[in-house]
Swiss-Prot record:
GO terms for biological process: L-histidine biosynthetic process. It comes from Exiguobacterium sibiricum (strain DSM 17290 / CCUG 55495 / CIP 109462 / JCM 13490 / 255-15). It is found in: Cytoplasm. The active site is at C78, H168, E170. Transmembrane segments: none annotated. Pfam families: GATase. Keywords: Amino-acid biosynthesis, Cytoplasm, Glutamine amidotransferase, Histidine biosynthesis, Hydrolase, Lyase. The keyword Metal-binding does not apply. It catalyses: 5-[(5-phospho-1-deoxy-D-ribulos-1-ylimino)methylamino]-1-(5-phospho-beta-D-ribosyl)imidazole-4-carboxamide + L-glutamine = D-erythro-1-(imidazol-4-yl)glycerol 3-phosphate + 5-amino-1-(5-phospho-beta-D-ribosyl)imidazole-4-carboxamide + L-glutamate + H(+); L-glutamine + H2O = L-glutamate + NH4(+). The keyword Lyase applies. It comes from the Bacteria. Pathway: Amino-acid biosynthesis; L-histidine biosynthesis; L-histidine from 5-phospho-alpha-D-ribose 1-diphosphate: step 5/9. Its main location: cytoplasm. This is Imidazole glycerol phosphate synthase subunit HisH.
């Protein structure tokens, strides 16, 4: 069973629908016991970094998620991916979950923001749907795929059991479903493979 973390911020219905379309058993919850019982966790997110971190703190999820990320497959999507890192410079400096070393920084001012629309992944070679103005800056060894948008933007990162997708797989049609399926089949079944 996959649990989608419900902390009041995120595009939950679409990611739930996408995972169910792949035949997954899915629950949407903020209940720590149910989240702890899940085989894998998905942290969605839409909006701004600081309010999202505040919601995670209000719901008592920060330490729990930090611990769970060392025990089971954990997927952060869009803002959910950004929250995995140590901090963001959005609206000042905001501390993140710190599950992945690295920061989240505003994309260059010489490109149109937000970065919205379809963009081809360098390694997978297929287009996925993005909506964001900030991107991760992290160890290149963890970047599974990327796009070029004013700078190198990590589109998929993976370290141990933790995976982040900056784009919205649930809004990326068949390609998004394929990438979610790859995450489920590889990351959830083996800590040694990457998507």
């Amino acid at each position: 069973m996959i649990a989608i973390v419900d902390y009041g911020v995120g595009n939950i219905a679409n990611i739930e629908r996408a995972l169910k379309e792949l035949g997954e058993a899915v629950i949407v919850t903020s209940d720590l016991e149910l989240l702890g019982q899940a085989e894998a966790l998905v942290l969605p997110g839409v909006g701004a970094y600081a309010p999202a971190m505040a919601r995670l703190e209000e719901t008592g999820l920060i330490e729990f998620l930090q611990e769970q990320a060392t025990k089971k497959p954990f997927l952060g999507i869009c803002l959910g991916m950004q929250l995995l890192f140590e901090s963001s410079d959005e609206d000042g400096q905001t501390e993140g979950l710190g599950i992945l070393p690295g920061t989240v920084e505003k994309l260059p001012s010489d490109v149109r923001l937000p970065h919205m629309g379809w963009h081809q992944l360098k390694n997978h070679g297929e287009a996925v749907y993005f909506v964001h103005s900030y991107g991760a800056v992290c160890d290149p060894d963890w970047i599974v795929d990327s796009v070029e948008y004013g700078r190198l933007v990590p589109a998929i990162v993976q370290k141990d059991l933790v995976t982040g997708m900056q784009f919205h797989p649930e809004k990326s049609g068949e390609v998004g479903l394929k990438l979610l399926k790859e995450w489920r089949e590889t990351t959830c079944n083996s800590t040694q493979q990457s998507i």
